[in-house]
Amino acid sequence: MPLLWLRGFLLASCWIIVKSSPTPGSEGHSAAPNCPSCALATLPKDVPNAQPEMVEAVKKHILNMLHLKKRPDVTQPVPKAALLNAIRKLHVGKVGENGYVEIEDDIGRRAEMNELMEQTSEIITFAESGTARKTLHFEISKEGSDLSVVERAEVWLFLKVPKANRTRSKVTIRLLQQQKHPQGSSDTREEAEEADLMEERSEQLISEKVVDARKSTWHIFPVSSSIQRLLDQGKSSLDIRIACDQCHETGASLVLLGKKKKKEEEGEGKKKDGGEAGAGVDEEKEQSHRPFLMLQARQSEDHPHRRRRRGLECDGKVNICCKKQFFVSFKDIGWNDWIIAPSGYHANYCEGECPSHIAGTSGSSLSFHSTVINQYRLRGHNPFANLKSCCVPTKLRPMSMLYYDDGQNIIKKDIQNMIVEECGCS
């Protein structure tokens, strides 16, 4: 819902700019809307007094976001030593070697974490029976082919404990990854099969845990580093052997049931006591306790798909929609007496053209809705034929500020959607 509201607000702001822009030859400039990006984009930048106008627009925007009618009047500033001591005690910032205050940007870190969570995928892979006894095979889904950074990976195993008395209350469960080392190359299928039987295998301990053997329950084994190594090697298969040397003393057993084992046990169950119904119930319960691998992963920062989604930076060489960097130092505008941190504001804004061939592509558009509208407009369909696309922010990030109010109180405020990160066509 917040994302839809933001998109609606940006589209409405863009429409206001188009409607309120003066016609050629008219005097003055239209009133700047609250959106700093749109306001700065409409200001003339090729005239000598353009910079002061842009700075004034930034000032008004900051005061508006802080819900202030005017800048606070700091007549008796707090002594710097007292200020720095309070900041250290309250952990709202840190003091650099030069004496400047650096605010703890918790909200920025939270926004980055939320963005990473949105880009993270969760994959659950159920175990298949391995080629050897007490081994499991996990085949990671192809959905994870673009995911190269493992956030978390866990193997879930169910330990079944009988109700009879036991001699042990704890058992150790170990997960050993099986690795193959081929011996040379094979030319024919027969040679390949023979080589597979003769190849060297090694085991590596990837997870170990001491668990309670007094009750039947699930146990979680972290295997993040092992899965990360597999992905780094371009592999998608994990073979592990489960070892529990003390389990036989307690009567406990790990449920290691895959599809292959189920078929084998179905045949055995029919032979024993002719109890097909009872065996079926047990098998169903066993299947509900089937081991699985839970994987949380995301794309790397340099993944080509992620790079394509980033907006353009204005470099003076392009005239299509891009982000223009604009930094205002609070010291330069005389506001460092009441704003403690940060030292300035990145008042980035969007500018540039949105030609039909650019606005109609999903990679540069604000939304799928914008792409559809532009496709209709290109075909001359009413009522979209006369609509024009404009360059607006598509991604905003928050900003934290530390400042004095009129009562000389120190205020820390986290302001959402303050800094333009990316631009696109509406």
Swiss-Prot record:
Extent of Basic and acidic residues compositional bias: 263-275
Residues annotated as signal peptide: 1-20
Ranges annotated as biased composition (Polar residues): 177-186
Compartment list: Secreted
Example of a GO cellular component annotation carried by this entry: extracellular region
Keyword Secreted applies: yes
Cystine crosslinks: 314-322, 321-391, 350-423, 354-425
Propeptide residue intervals: 21-310
Example of a GO MF term: growth factor activity
GO terms, biological process: activin receptor signaling pathway; eyelid development in camera-type eye; hair follicle development; hematopoietic progenitor cell differentiation; hemoglobin biosynthetic process; male gonad development; negative regulation of cell growth; negative regulation of cell population proliferation
Region feature Disordered, mapped onto this chain: 177-201, 260-291
Residues that carry a glycan: 165
Short name of one Pfam family: TGF_beta
SUPFAM superfamilies noted in UniProt: Cystine-knot cytokines
Keywords: Cleavage on pair of basic residues, Disulfide bond, Glycoprotein, Growth factor, Hormone, Secreted, Signal
InterPro entries, sorted: Cystine-knot_cytokine (IPR029034), Inhibin_betaA (IPR000491), TGF-b_C (IPR001839), TGF-b_propeptide (IPR001111), TGF-beta-rel (IPR015615), TGFb_CS (IPR017948)
Family: Belongs to the TGF-beta family.
Assembly and binders: Dimeric, linked by one or more disulfide bonds. Inhibin A is a dimer of alpha/INHA and beta-A/INHBA. Activin A is a homodimer of beta-A/INHBA. Activin AB is a dimer of beta-A/INHBA and beta-B/INHBB. Interacts with FST and FSTL3; these interactions prevent activin A interaction to its type II receptor. Activin A interacts with ACVR2A. Activin A interacts with BMPR2. Inhibin A interacts with ACVR1; this interaction creates a non-signaling complex (NSC) that inhibits ACVR1-mediated BMP signaling. Inhibin A interacts with ACVR2A.
Record function comment: Inhibins/activins are involved in regulating a number of diverse functions such as hypothalamic and pituitary hormone secretion, gonadal hormone secretion, germ cell development and maturation, erythroid differentiation, insulin secretion, nerve cell survival, embryonic axial development or bone growth, depending on their subunit composition.
UniProt name for this protein: Inhibin beta A chain
Species assigned in the record: Equus caballus
